[in-house]
Amino acid sequence: MGTMPKDMMDFWFGDTVNKGGLDARTRLLLTLAGLTMQGAQNDMALRQTVRHAREAGATKQHIVETISQMSVFAGLPAMTRALELAQSVLDEEKDTKKEDGA
C-alpha cells in the first residue's frame, strides 16, 4: 500500500493548518504514539503512519523510541505489537531498496 501524495501530507501533517506549529514528522510520531496507546489494534493505520513518518524524515530510531516510550503507558504487549508492525514496514522498505538496486 502506498502513501498519500506530498501535498496532502503537507496539508494534514505539515504546517498548512497551523503555521509555526508542529512539523509533519513530529505530528506523525505523535500519531504513532497514539496508535500504540490504543494497543496497536489497527494494523493498517499503524503501518501507514510508519510509512508516512519515514517519508516525513523520521529515522528508524525515532520510530522505535516513540513506540518504546509508550510501553510505560500502554504496556509491553502493545509495544511489542507496534514494534512488530513497524519492523515489517522497515523490512519492506529495505526489500524495495534491494529491488531498485540501491
Residue map of PLM features:
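Extended intrinsically disordered, low-complexity coil regions enriched in Ser, Thr, Gly, Ala
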Residues: 42-61, 81-89
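Short alpha-helix boundary/capping elements
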Residues: 34-42, 58, 74-75
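Acidic, glycine/proline-rich low-complexity segments that act as flexible tails and inter-domain linkers
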Residues: 1-28, 37, 55, 79-102
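Substrate/cofactor-recognition hotspot
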Residues: 69, 76-77
